Swiss-Prot record:
Keywords: Acetylation, Autophagy, Cytoplasm, Cytoplasmic vesicle, Disulfide bond, Endoplasmic reticulum, Glycoprotein, Hydrolase, Isopeptide bond, Mitochondrion, Phosphoprotein, Protease, Protein transport, S-nitrosylation, Thiol protease, Transport, Ubl conjugation, Ubl conjugation pathway. The lineage of its organism: Eukaryota, Metazoa, Chordata, Craniata, Vertebrata. Belongs to the peptidase C54 family. This is Cysteine protease ATG4B. It is found in: Cytoplasm; Cytoplasm, Cytosol; Cytoplasmic vesicle, Autophagosome; Endoplasmic reticulum. The gene is Atg4b. Cysteine protease that plays a key role in autophagy by mediating both proteolytic activation and delipidation of ATG8 family proteins. Required for canonical autophagy (macroautophagy), non-canonical autophagy as well as for mitophagy. The protease activity is required for proteolytic activation of ATG8 family proteins: cleaves the C-terminal amino acid of ATG8 proteins MAP1LC3A, MAP1LC3B, MAP1LC3C, GABARAPL1, GABARAPL2 and GABARAP, to reveal a C-terminal glycine. InterPro entries: ATG4_LIR (IPR046793), Papain-like_cys_pep_sf (IPR038765), Peptidase_C54 (IPR005078), Peptidase_C54_cat (IPR046792).
Length: 393
């Protein structure tokens, strides 16, 4: 439990275990590396992911609520990380790399702004926690992978700069026809009146200089999140190889999930170990200067990432993929179909062209779900919460 509530001030990065000397390839979000010849490239790739951890001394959530998420916000932070990776792929590309003390493009700061711990950032801990209240989750209550996915989907509607099509595949089924219809739709931003004013936009996820347009496009970039349960109390070994292959796909956003007492953002694997970013470090909240300069070093993991055995993974997870173009989606579909040919491996989800007749829940496609929709969906996945324990403050 102590390891789950480390503070940034006392954290010794030298204590983190380095990668093992192995001939096994290292897979990080669709990229393959050799530990012998590409160690620096591996660490650079890991350091370039946005790392969101517990924070303290941020503005009170809701004005009178918590000023720290230590002990309860780890799944929310993991949701931020997987969604931030989607925005990085959307605006910077998968091959973009962060370098300490090197000037980054404006789009990078625009993405980072969207996740700062302030009420007017689109995907802030404040927005996620308060949106969760509307879905029956009190502030400080544990979120399972499905719950945080549902909340992020609702928040994405307001992010017209990114213009993402967010689809959450329920019942372990991905329906290609529904996704194509969603991504080809040119829907106006629901709740546009709630967007920040021009004077506010330079300090949040919809900043000055970010191009926002209503011009129609053939395909809105897809964020596909698939909540899954890969066993009762432990992960079924028959899913392990399929899970590994998800990290090999170029469209991979990783996996959110974890083990009892903690949630993690899994970004790859080596051998029989998963590689993950751990949110269980408490850092001071970042304060913006008058010029809105963001001290960003604490948002990047500059030490070897954590690892855990695949068998330790709690079976409740959400797998994420990003398809910027329709060609990306078609390629992803072909790769998923090939997974069925893995000997001795079970598919984690089903890919179908049209919705099966036994699935009648059309509401999951709505960009703006009402509370009854989400409550119905969460009842199906309530079991995901029971296997996690809430960390004490």
């Amino acid at each position: 439990m102590d390891a789950a509530t480390l503070t940034y001030d006392t954290l010794r990065f030298a204590e983190f275990e380095d990668f093992p000397e192995t001939s096994e390839p290292v897979w990080i979000l669709g990229r393959k590396y050799s530990i012998f010849t590409e160690k620096d490239e591996i660490l650079s790739d890991v350091a370039s992911r946005l790392w969101f951890t517990y924070r303290r001394n941020f503005p009170a959530i809701g004005g009178t609520g918590p000023t720290s998420d230590t002990g309860w916000g780890c799944m929310l932070r993991c949701g931020q990380m997987i969604f931030a990776q989607a925005l990085v792929c959307r605006h910077l590309g998968r091959d973009w790399r962060w370098t300490q003390r090197k000037r980054q493009p404006d789009s990078y700061f625009n993405v980072l702004n969207a996740f700062l711990d302030r009420k007017d950032s689109y995907y802030s801990i404040h927005q996620i926690a308060q949106m969760g209240v509307g879905e029956g989750k009190s502030i400080g209550q544990w979120y399972g992978p499905n719950t945080v996915a549902q909340v992020l989907k609702k928040l994405a509607v307001f992010d017209t700069w990114s213009s993402l099509a967010v689809h959450i595949a329920m019942d372990n089924t991905v329906v290609m026809e529904e996704i194509r219809r969603l991504c080809r739709a040119n829907l106006p931003c629901a709740g546009a009146a709630a967007l920040p004013t021009d004077s506010e936009r330079h300090c949040n996820g919809f900043p000055a200089g970010a191009e926002v347009t209503n011009r129609p496009s053939a395909w809105r970039p897809l964020v596909l999140l698939i909540p899954l349960r890969l066993g009762l109390t432990d992960i079924n070994e028959a899913y392990v190889e399929t899970l590994k292959h998800c990290f090999m796909m170029p469209q991979s956003l990783g996996v959110i999930g974890g083990k009892p007492n903690s949630a993690h953002y899994f970004i790859g694997y080596v051998g029989e170990e998963l590689i993950y970013l751990d949110p269980h470090t408490t850092q001071p909240a970042v304060e913006l200067t008058d010029s809105c300069f963001i001290p960003d070093e604490s948002f990047h993991c500059q030490h070897p990432p954590s690892r855990m055995g695949i068998g330790e993974l709690d079976p409740s997870i959400a797998v994420g993929f990003f398809c910027k173009t329709e060609e990306d989606f078609n390629d992803w579909c072909q790769q998923v179909k090939k997974l069925s040919q893995l000997g001795g491996a079970l598919p984690m989800f089903e890919l179908v062209e049209q919705q099966p007749s036994h699935l009648a829940c059309q509401d999951v496609l709505n960009l703006s779900l009402d509370s009854s929709d989400v409550e119905r969906l969460e009842r199906f996945f309530d079991s995901e919460d029971e296997d996690f324990e809430i960390l004490s403050l």
